[in-house]
Amino acid sequence: MNTEQLKQAFLDVFGQEADATFFSPGRINLIGEHTDYNGGHVFPAAITLGTYGAARKRDDQVLRFYSANFEELGIIEVDLNNLVFDKADNWTNYAKGVLKFLKEAGHVIDTGMEVFVYGNIPNGSGLSSSASLELLIGIIAEELYGLELTRLDLVKIGKQTENHFIGVNSGIMDQFAIGMGADNRAIYLDTNSLEYELVPLDLGDHVIVIMNTNKRRELADSKYNERRAECEKAVEELNAVLNIQTLGELDEWTFDQYSYLIKDENRIKRARHAVLENQRTLQARKALEEGDLATFGRLVNASHVSLEHDYEVTGLELDTLAHTAWEQEGVLGARMTGAGFGGCGIAIVHKDKVEAFKENVGKTYTEVVGYAPSFYVAEIAGGSRVLSRK
């Protein structure tokens, strides 16, 4: 959707011109899965699929939201002074949460607004449509009300919304990748200190293919919070001898030495994934910087194996995509990305082999799962931004 289409769509819905238009990307994560809430490193990148917005300030206390993705819901009206979670308000709860926490942080949002939203991130795909929406609302509020915010402020508000308004105990990676993204750069982020580096994503003759299982995953209703609790319990058990805050502080040798302290086989597996995935992420960044794409690809594969066997968050659909991808010509590596339990995988594929890859993986997946996957070539692009002003 281009800027003119956005402006026209806003005019069609609300009968007035928008003050500004906006875009907030989705994200993929190259490696470093389920490490963000374990104090480890992640390596995400913002993509050109995302959420578009157009907005206009009102002079009363009414918020009016419309999504082209949920046309059947029509315009949802919300009282600016009653920003509480209400299931009936559907997707606008994300917007309400962001505005609530902005206000609580002392930012003056004294009138309502009208917001048109259109997203081309497949819903429930694990490409962070919710974090994309949170950051979109954040930059809309920043622009319309002249708020003085750093981008990190908005990233933290997005995470706060996810954790304390929506009720998902997620880490900061998604919002960070979406807020801080840059063209052709991946973000190497230490989720403990929030120190980060923009690393050039030079894959030579290879491209990143997003593989969508087309099996929707619901993060809040999944085993995501259970995995987090298992890791927190493992830290507690390790601290009978050690003194750590998170699993991300350990290397594999220290973990092996003290894993006997963890009293449950499943918790040992969960913790082992968190520790080793963090180490893989450190190695992957080094490999990428040295142009060693073969090693980078092997680490990506190893990440999936660990998520499948130790963290157990993949399932038939994601495993079929990854395992089939590994067998294809021109593939450096493939794995699930995001929280798992459905959603998407990524594959690093030679650009001349992309069509054959899609055909072969699609055919096998359809035979095994019973319906077709979708494929998109990911372009790595900048973070949430204003597209145009009136």
Swiss-Prot record:
Gene3D superfamilies named in the record: 3.30.230.10, GHMP kinase, C-terminal domain
Residues the entry annotates as binding ATP: 67, 124-130
Annotated substrate binding sites: 33-36, 224
Pathway info: Carbohydrate metabolism; galactose metabolism
Localization: Cytoplasm
GO CC term, one of those recorded: cytosol
A Pfam family assignment: GalKase_gal_bdg
Claim: Repeat is one of the keywords in the record: no
PROSITE patterns in the cross-refs: GALACTOKINASE, GHMP_KINASES_ATP
Reactions catalysed, as given in the entry: alpha-D-galactose + ATP = alpha-D-galactose 1-phosphate + ADP + H(+)
Annotated catalytic residues: 174 (proton acceptor)
Listed InterPro entries: Galactokinase (IPR000705), Galactokinase_bac (IPR022963), Galactokinase_CS (IPR019741), GalKase_N (IPR019539), GHMP_kinase_C_dom (IPR013750), GHMP_kinase_C_sf (IPR036554), GHMP_kinase_N_dom (IPR006204), GHMP_knse_ATP-bd_CS (IPR006203)
Keywords from the UniProt entry: ATP-binding, Carbohydrate metabolism, Cytoplasm, Galactose metabolism, Kinase, Magnesium, Metal-binding, Nucleotide-binding, Transferase
Amino acids binding Mg(2+): 130, 162
Single GO MF annotation: magnesium ion binding
Single GO BP term: galactose metabolic process
EC number(s) recorded for this UniProt protein: 2.7.1.6
PANTHER family membership: GALACTOKINASE-RELATED, MEVALONATE KINASE/GALACTOKINASE
Family recorded in the similarity comment: Belongs to the GHMP kinase family. GalK subfamily.
NCBIfam families according to UniProt: gal_kin, PRK05322.1
Function: Catalyzes the transfer of the gamma-phosphate of ATP to D-galactose to form alpha-D-galactose-1-phosphate (Gal-1-P).
Protein name (Swiss-Prot/TrEMBL): Galactokinase
Chain's gene name: galK
